Swiss-Prot record:
Species the sequence originates in: Arabidopsis thaliana
Annotated protein name in UniProt: Probable 9-cis-epoxycarotenoid dioxygenase NCED5, chloroplastic
Molecular-function GO term, any one: 9-cis-epoxycarotenoid dioxygenase activity
Name of the gene: NCED5
Residue numbers spanned by region Disordered: 21-51
Induction: Low induction by drought stress.
Amino acid sequence: MACSYILTPNPTKLNLSFAPSDLDAPSPSSSVSFTNTKPRRRKLSANSVSDTPNLLNFPNYPSPNPIIPEKDTSRWNPLQRAASAALDFAETALLRRERSKPLPKTVDPRHQISGNYAPVPEQSVKSSLSVDGKIPDCIDGVYLRNGANPLFEPVSGHHLFDGDGMVHAVKITNGDASYSCRFTETERLVQEKQLGSPIFPKAIGELHGHSGIARLMLFYARGLFGLLNHKNGTGVANAGLVYFHDRLLAMSEDDLPYQVRVTDNGDLETIGRFDFDGQLSSAMIAHPKIDPVTKELFALSYDVVKKPYLKYFKFSPEGEKSPDVEIPLASPTMMHDFAITENFVVIPDQQVVFKLSDMFLGKSPVKYDGEKISRFGILPRNAKDASEMVWVESPETFCFHLWNAWESPETDEVVVIGSCMTPADSIFNECDEQLNSVLSEIRLNLKTGKSTRRTIIPGSVQMNLEAGMVNRNLLGRKTRYAYLAIAEPWPKVSGFAKVDLSTGEVKNHFYGGKKYGGEPFFLPRGLESDGEDDGYIMSFVHDEESWESELHIVNAVTLELEATVKLPSRVPYGFHGTFVNSADMLNQA
């Protein structure tokens, strides 16, 4: 989400404890347990929302606590202290009002962060991990995966996408593996740790309806009195990871990227918010694309408040930014992903839009616009402005992710591969319809302005496929295979599918039993690779019976399990990953 807003409740910190008897997620009975083992029945305080009763109270299962510094307000003057007390009083009243109404499942923390979606504490490097099987000799570097991991317990609405960014890393050298996980120290998280409470708003979980407006007013009031500072960004950096310009970048579309450094022993340290030496002043979406031949990075930035609602830009391999190309849109549109070909960028303008005025009507600002016709914009990669943009309509098409795109000169078409999701806004707004994510081929004719769409997998073997990739060495070129998470039973991932994009043939790899994973990351075998699928699939897998997590390494040709790395602590289900080879690690800026 790209809502750059801020706010301030004041709850207790998470105890990060989980009971193995309640592991099924999402379920209200799934167990995330906090500092207290019994429900709190304290009287609400008039001056601190930290005394508000917890939303979640579950049995305690021993687990390390996060280290949170004592609240430091020593720099505040008497006026600021008085303002803080008054605003806390107002927020306590707001929370009382919110607690009188049930939360929809899409923002209820008892659903959103239960079971193995629940957060974990940081883990310092653990080396010489147990390995079943043999790690292929060609794997030399670090596999990293990003995810949402809230440090503080929610006091109100919370969506899975709202959590603080945490990167999990497995470093592999000569068949030996180590593991660590660390929060990305965003400006948001640093301030929250200083004040001992989540003072920034949750863009999806809290900013909706009249209470969302009230939270924004509280936030701006706190900023006015100098109780917080949002000028250095409000993002969580929890979604994407990319290695570019000698830097590992953690990203979410509500802020600039953050540079994270991998240390020699496999630990992680946040360097800071990265603006490409002052060239980048706006947020960047979490799915930039790197051309495997030119090594350029392509990106978008969208704004939900003011025009231009969308901008396109690129970076040279040396990190030099191009001028922004403003893309004309009638309204702010969710732009989570896009695609590139050898000569074009492919930009989806779909039916999930932002309408902030709906908050005054008590509604969510994220909505499905049934009157809008979805379309794709095809823009030359080196365009100086949007005058060369060709728009092709593709009705009723919503792809949260696009896996690849390429040009078909013989038919004057651009071919786009994506998972078409219905209902389009079901991730954000509660609905009764069953969610479907259908792998599709969308053909955009640049001469006629017409489009066609076909389902790639036959109906008899149709399944929800979300999160995955093609061989990134062929990004923007025609690919035969895609590796995609089997999101069943939704939202869990029971395995992954290797799909032949031409024939629709599907080969599945299931984790088995009560094991579930996430995004399958394809790692090419190396320069000596014999074919497009010559490589390995890497994915974190969690066993909901033993409550243990592993890294699985699967042969991408045969789909046979090559090695299993036993991890020292639980890895929650998360988002997107990357791999940094050992040579690049040595060259980090």
